Amino acid sequence: AGEIKELDSDDAVDILSELSDEKKEKVISLIKDENITENIRELLNYDEDTAGGLMAKELISVNENWSVLKCLGEIRKQAKDITRVHSIYVLNKKEELIGRLSLKDLIISPSKKKIKQIYIPKVDYVNVNDSGEDVAKLMRKYDLEAIPVINDDRQLLGRITICLLYTSDAADDDTRV
């Protein structure tokens, strides 16, 4: 359980999905961090060949109403749990994905400026139920390193990175990114 909690959520689920239900529950029960166990349980519910089954929960998200200064502080906190930051996703008060944030724009903007004044409203995304093959095609088409995963209410659930697709069986060899 100690090693499992150190992994990204998608990697932990890949390992746990190989275990029997009984062993899986035993390992999960040994993890003391509720946030980690909640993420693992959520990911175990998705079919492994869907965007939900491919995604990792670790990502950076910010609120459109935050100032640049608050945003930088929150990003520092969130980034501690992420191996590699590909994108910064912008959410509204309903936790809906509304855009992405350029690191350059964030760095050069005055500290009191609001994120809603500098974010980029265009963002490609996939639905949690989209097939892994469709995700691979979209990422290849737009040359994306990462893509956010949303539910039917446009709420941000996770992200899929190019690395996840390379290591996944969800995309057929001929559609692999």
Protein language model regions, located:
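Single conserved hydrophobic/aromatic residue that forms the stacking wall/gate
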Residues: Y166-V177
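Hydrophobic packing positions in regular secondary-structure scaffolds
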Residues: A1-S168
